[in-house]
Amino acid sequence: MKSDEIIEAVIGAKALAVLTGAGVSTLSGIPDFRGPQGLYKNPDAERIFDIDWFDRDPSIYYNGCRELVYGLNKYAPSACHLTLAKLEKRGILKGIATQNIDMLHQRAGSEAVYEVHGSPRLHHCRNCGKARAYAEIVAELETKGERLTAQDVPRCACGGVFKPDITFFGEALPEEAFVASQELAIRADVMLVIGTSLTVFPAAGLPRLTLQAGGRVFIVNGSPTPLDDYASGKAEDIASFSAMLSHRRPGFCSMAVTLLSMLSTLSDMTLCFSAITAMLVAMLSSVSCLRSTSSSRC
């Protein structure tokens, strides 16, 4: 299936869900943890995100992640992040389940984001539970020397170490985010998987929930995945796909379906008239885009 056919299915979805992985963030310049320049090439890789090692010597984590995790502000959301945010604002996308910890979906403007592996947005004291914001931790680390000892890492007034709300090996996934992701997958009539090889569970099981519930799954990833044979379509170039999706507007058929759905829930004639007017404006805008593909509004 060609990319434009996948895009038609995505735009026409009644309840679109998206699962994103590292391939989305590499477009922003963030190294894939498992890539050639990734964190897992670090000799301490197995210990960096291990909760037992963190409690034993938190400097292993803070030294290993100082550049990648605490330098995230230098990266900007990619075209893919921005496109997904637009789809949410248009009411097509119902939510994003992401394996990424970089918070770029939120910076792009997405609101319904479920971080199934957590994120460093908040840090909590391992002793008393007090929370500190990511920006505070970054600011503190900027005052420290190049190499941290266990005593140099961010600590609470009680003496406890601040740990990011990233899921470490040996910890359970954040229950609220993962349950919400499962519900999102089950309700979706279309799930779009972008930038993940679907090998890390339990997040990799989310598209299967969509399939089991009767929905369709489309995959955009540069390498094969275990679900390729079960997907309704597959594309490989994430950047190209994102660009095409960004410039695609709903066709008349999908607009008409949306209009009828809206009117069926409205009893007040004034509201009905307003809904019809809004849809006609959107249709005229779509025609304008088709006639002038170079228009910035397209």
Task: For each feature predicted by the language model, list its residue ranges.
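Conserved catalytic core of sirtuin-type NAD+-dependent deacylases
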Residues: 1-248
